[in-house]
From Swiss-Prot:
InterPro entries: Biofilm_formation_YgiB. The gene is ygiB. Pfam families: DUF1190. Belongs to the UPF0441 family. Residues 204-223 have a biased composition (Polar residues). The lineage of its organism: Bacteria, Pseudomonadati, Pseudomonadota, Gammaproteobacteria, Enterobacterales. It comes from Salmonella newport (strain SL254). Residues 178-223 are annotated as: Disordered. Residues 178-195 have a biased composition (Low complexity). This is UPF0441 protein YgiB. It comes from the Bacteria.
Length: 223
């Protein structure tokens, strides 16, 4: 009889443990679900300039202008920089490059090198910008400059890309799309000049990574 009692006690302990671990497992699941929500994508709109934004958002002209001007400043800080106009044009096409402000993020030694060779350094024009809500649920808007190449030989040809080379599809303003929240985070300042074709290589690598990630996600969802 004592043995039977011992067996019953063991069974009871197992049953008790199972019942009391279940809420813990549920709590862990809830934490992961919340973490997933925090990393969720957000909807952004793509505009060429402040006028496009204002036309699509009546009554938000001031916000559109502020976002556009902030995107221009961000473009000066983070856009790829080239030592010569020719290098920039080879990447982005004729009429798509401008002289970059001397204070736009480039390290002093690189500024001196570029200025010695051509009198200045060069960057692509901002082709458009993404606009979305501020991270953290603020009342204002976040923005991210976009660039595009007019050179058919470039991987960035006809596409909107950010300063890191990530591709956001066709360079057509007025679109709305869903992007990761990290897409709207500030990019690091450009501190070195890019060699000819270097930005295009970054775009090609980013596109390959995006396709690979999309394929992995599809396979995971399909089991």
């Amino acid at each position: 009889m004592k043995r039977t009692k011992s067996i019953h006690h063991a069974s009871f302990r197992k049953s008790w443990s199972a019942r009391h671990l279940t809420p813990v497992a549920l709590a862990v699941t809830a934490v992961f679900m919340l973490a997933g929500c925090e990393k969720s994508d957000e909807t952004v709109s793509l505009y060429q300039n402040a006028d496009d934004c204002s036309a699509a958002n009546p009554g938000k002209s001031a916000e559109c202008t502020t976002a556009y001007n902030n995107a221009l400043k961000e473009a000066e800080r983070t856009a790829p920089k080239y030592a010569t106009r020719e290098d920039c044009v080879a990447e982005f096409g004729e009429g798509q490059c401008q002289q970059a402000p001397a204070q736009a993020g480039l390290a002093p030694e690189n500024q001196a090198q570029a200025q010695q060779s051509s009198g200045s350094f060069w960057m692509p024009l901002m082709a458009g910008y993404m606009m979305g809500r501020l991270m953290g649920g603020g009342a204002g808007f976040a923005q991210q400059p976009l660039f595009s190449s007019k050179n058919p030989a470039s991987p960035a040809y006809g596409k909107y890309t950010d300063a890191a080379g990530k591709n956001y599809g066709a360079a057509q303003p007025g679109r709305t799309m869903t992007v990761p929240k990290t897409a709207m985070a500030p990019k690091p300042a450009t501190t070195t000049t890019v060699t000819r074709g270097g930005f295009g290589e970054s775009v090609a690598k980013q596109s390959t990574m995006q396709r690979s990630a999309a394929g992995t996600s599809t396979r995971s969802m399909g089991g």
